[in-house]
Amino acid sequence: MAKGKDVRIRVILQCVSCVRKGANEESAGISRYSTQKNRHNTPGQLELRKFCRYCRKHTIHAEIKK
């Protein structure tokens, strides 16, 4: 039997620089990735360095609320 909530949850990561700029002028859009995180190991907000196809470079992607 499972106890309480699951340890692994699904999170969505969003590009921080695209959000600040309000999306690029040449291509409208915000880069998003979906992944999982372990609540016990990472209780805070998850931030990973991933490739943003709209900025065309590696940027920080932060966890957003659903």
Curated annotation (Swiss-Prot):
This is Large ribosomal subunit protein bL33c. PROSITE patterns: RIBOSOMAL_L33. It comes from the Eukaryota. Belongs to the bacterial ribosomal protein bL33 family. GO terms for cellular component: chloroplast; plastid; ribonucleoprotein complex; ribosome. Pfam families: Ribosomal_L33. The keyword Chloroplast applies. It comes from Oryza sativa subsp. japonica. The keyword Chloroplast applies. GO terms for biological process: translation. It is found in: Plastid, Chloroplast. PANTHER family: 50S RIBOSOMAL PROTEIN L33, CHLOROPLASTIC, LARGE RIBOSOMAL SUBUNIT PROTEIN BL33C. Keywords: Chloroplast, Plastid, Ribonucleoprotein, Ribosomal protein. Transmembrane segments: none annotated. InterPro entries: Ribosomal_bL33, Ribosomal_bL33_CS, Ribosomal_bL33_sf, Ribosomal_zn-bd. One of its GO terms (molecular function) is structural constituent of ribosome.
